[in-house]
Amino acid sequence: SYFGDKSSCIENGSALNLTSSSARGLNSTCVGKTPLSSSRSVCRSHTPLMGLSVTSSSAVSAHSVASVIVAVVEGRGLARGEVGMASIDLKNPEVILSQFADNTTYAKVITKLKILTPLEIVMSNTACDAGNTTKLFSLITEHFKNVTFTTVQRKYFNETKGLEYIEQLCASEFSTVFMEVQSKYYCLAAAAALLKYVEFIQNSVYAPKSLKVRFQGSEKTAMIDSSSAQNLELVINNRDSRNGHTLFGVLNYTKTPGGSRRLRSNILEPLVDAETINTRLDCVQELLQDEELFFGLQAVISKFLDTEQLLSVLVQIPKQDTVKAAESKITNLIYLKHTLELVEPLKAALRSCNTSLLKAYYNSLEDTRFGIILEKITTVINDDTRYTKGCLSMRTQKCYAVKPNINEFLDIARRTYTEIVDDIAGI
């Protein structure tokens, strides 16, 4: 297979069998073994996130589960210090690329990784060769002791393949990124290794033209180094990491998981662009002055599920058709139908807005494709199928989601199921 066995772990010469939780509890460096010829000390456990777990969006946890995978590569020889990074959140179909020159302390790399809070970091095997470990690898493993590390052969950090991936997967709306990154070889190399690896662990491929690809420079944001963020308790309480007494905890009245993620990112990497800040302040001012708009938006937005995570699972095509994959498709269609049915209420709430940003949001909701997708869904899914909370009620919704006469075998199975349920109820 593309990636080798990752179940062994050697620490100080003695073999250990570790579960995910025990591996992450160690203070030793945990490195995933990919196709390496050497028998270097390794420890590896990954968590594929193909399903969409839905919780109430009105109560977003301040400490969400990490779901970001990052690939990091550094130049060699005279290019040492030039770092390329590529990251993807398994709950969000967006690839973020970065390339920058860093100093010998690698403060920029550490800060960017702290902001991303990765589930897993992918690096080249040459960065951690026995007796020849790079300073970057040593610093990252020192700062991220509870993060899984995985190494892949250097040949998979291929900038040509990275550009091909971006051309193939980047949605047409974001195609201007090609011009930004075509000469940035290290972030392209990181993108190639990252996307190949994610496809491997997810056992799926991304649909063509389905990802948002963005090059993230640091020109319009302030950099807060990781030690300052920790000392100021911006997102994590130093006494108790589960305690919400932080700047993030005080400000987090967001109604969706996506909003919570955006707030966290803005706290750790605040904007310095005056125009953008003033545009946002205009929105705040309008919401303060128009009570009906404020509560109307709040009511609609709180009904949304994790839209970014839903999009992420929708654009992944499973390599194998299984019963579980089929069930996931039905579940995701119900979630998508629920989301699309909220477009009109959201438009109605935004209709009377005056600020440019809120008007832009309203105009984006005018896109006719929302209606076309919903119409296609309703040709197969019953109109009265609804997203409901609770496993049992959702199971019932899934059983009767597909309209009759679409598949005769499904109709027979469903009729049998109904008869059995009725018989049980009559006992």
Which positions does each model-derived feature cover?
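Helix-rich, typically C-terminal accessory recognition domains appended to large enzymatic cores
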Residues: 318-321
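Charged catalytic and DNA/RNA-contacting regions of genome-maintenance
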Residues: 1-289, 295, 301-312, 324-426
